[in-house]
């Protein structure tokens, strides 16, 4: 497999830690005790985190539960959980999953191919990371990426309906949030640890003051306007009402 500098694949291994930079630069596979014939019955849940922010990567996770391990209680859409609760569930998920993977597509690649294509790429790579044990993928949303290694279906609102998708949403969110804390250490002026790259007033004010850093998505309108330094860009960044208009121009 060719590893792009723009794409980092986190281990499908219960002992790998998403805060480990070295682990994020390689693809590891967990060993599956389940024969290939039985693996066709296992479903991978797939979800993303970070499509909308102005900075940082989009993270996509795939999770296959181990049917021989206890059920995890309290799973939900990651957006409905506190950060503390997500961390607790993350630890249980990676411990009890038969296999899991996380793919990070960085801002440079997002700008190159657009956020939609970056998300589809991440989904395909995440499913590839668990395809040795999963015979089917269930993906949150309304689109199935092309080129998946197994049959799949899209499930609108799946992060509130399917337990494996819920788990994937938690793994993706926790992984991305941890990385944004690392990026905060590199660029403290933006306070990535507070808003995780989303377009909050704090973040927009920092953009106006400091301009974009390498982690910002220059294809997103508020960042592009800040970079260009145009008068209308300054108005869009400083005025919350104008910001909503600017965000409509950004890829969804």
Swiss-Prot record:
<feature type="domain" description="RNase H type-2">
    <location>
        <begin position="41"/>
        <end position="232"/>
    </location>
</feature>
<comment type="function">
    <text>Endonuclease that specifically degrades the RNA of RNA-DNA hybrids.</text>
</comment>
<dbReference type="GO" id="GO:0006298">
    <property type="term" value="P:mismatch repair"/>
</dbReference>
<dbReference type="InterPro" id="IPR024567">
    <property type="entry name" value="RNase_HII/HIII_dom"/>
</dbReference>
<keyword id="KW-0479">Metal-binding</keyword>
<feature type="binding site">
    <location>
        <position position="48"/>
    </location>
    <ligand>
        <name>a divalent metal cation</name>
    </ligand>
</feature>
<keyword id="KW-0378">Hydrolase</keyword>
<dbReference type="InterPro" id="IPR022898">
    <property type="entry name" value="RNase_HII"/>
</dbReference>
<keyword id="KW-0540">Nuclease</keyword>
<dbReference type="GO" id="GO:0003723">
    <property type="term" value="F:RNA binding"/>
</dbReference>
<dbReference type="GO" id="GO:0032299">
    <property type="term" value="C:ribonuclease H2 complex"/>
</dbReference>
<dbReference type="GO" id="GO:0004523">
    <property type="term" value="F:RNA-DNA hybrid ribonuclease activity"/>
</dbReference>
<dbReference type="GO" id="GO:0005737">
    <property type="term" value="C:cytoplasm"/>
</dbReference>
<dbReference type="GO" id="GO:0043137">
    <property type="term" value="P:DNA replication, removal of RNA primer"/>
</dbReference>
<dbReference type="InterPro" id="IPR012337">
    <property type="entry name" value="RNaseH-like_sf"/>
</dbReference>
<dbReference type="InterPro" id="IPR001352">
    <property type="entry name" value="RNase_HII/HIII"/>
</dbReference>
<feature type="binding site">
    <location>
        <position position="140"/>
    </location>
    <ligand>
        <name>a divalent metal cation</name>
    </ligand>
</feature>
<keyword id="KW-0255">Endonuclease</keyword>
<protein>
    <recommendedName>
        <fullName>Ribonuclease HII</fullName>
        <ecNumber>3.1.26.4</ecNumber>
    </recommendedName>
</protein>
<dbReference type="Pfam" id="PF01351">
    <property type="entry name" value="RNase_HII"/>
</dbReference>
<comment type="similarity">
    <text>Belongs to the RNase HII family.</text>
</comment>
<keyword id="KW-0464">Manganese</keyword>
<feature type="binding site">
    <location>
        <position position="47"/>
    </location>
    <ligand>
        <name>a divalent metal cation</name>
    </ligand>
</feature>
<dbReference type="GO" id="GO:0030145">
    <property type="term" value="F:manganese ion binding"/>
</dbReference>
<keyword id="KW-0963">Cytoplasm</keyword>
<dbReference type="InterPro" id="IPR036397">
    <property type="entry name" value="RNaseH_sf"/>
</dbReference>
């Amino acid at each position: 497999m060719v590893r792009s500098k723009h794409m980092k694949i986190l281990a499908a291994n219960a002992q790998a830690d998403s805060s480990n930079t070295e682990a994020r630069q390689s693809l590891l596979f967990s060993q599956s005790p389940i024969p290939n014939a039985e693996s066709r019955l296992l479903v991978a849940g797939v979800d993303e985190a970070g499509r909308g922010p102005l900075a940082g990567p989009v993270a996509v996770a795939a999770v296959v539960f181990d049917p021989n391990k206890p059920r995890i209680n309290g799973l939900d859409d990651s957006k409905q959980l506190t950060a503390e609760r997500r961390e607790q569930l993350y630890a249980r998920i990676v411990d009890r999953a038969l296999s899991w993977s996380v793919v990070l597509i960085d801002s440079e690649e997002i700008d190159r191919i657009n956020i939609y294509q970056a998300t589809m790429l991440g989904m395909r790579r995440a499913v590839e990371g668990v395809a040795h044990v999963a015979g089917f993928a269930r993906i949150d949303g309304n689109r199935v990426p092309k080129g998946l290694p197994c049959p799949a279906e899209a499930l609108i609102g799946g992060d509130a309906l399917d337990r494996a998708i819920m788990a994937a949403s938690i793994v993706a969110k926790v992984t991305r949030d941890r990385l944004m804390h690392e990026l905060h250490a590199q660029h403290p002026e933006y306070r990535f640890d507070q808003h995780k790259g989303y377009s909050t007033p704090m973040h927009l004010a920092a953009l106006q003051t400091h301009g974009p850093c390498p982690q910002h998505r220059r294809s997103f309108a508020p960042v592009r306007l800040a970079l260009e330094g145009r008068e209308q860009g300054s108005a869009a960044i400083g005025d919350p009402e104008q910001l909503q208009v600017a965000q409509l121009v950004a890829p969804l």
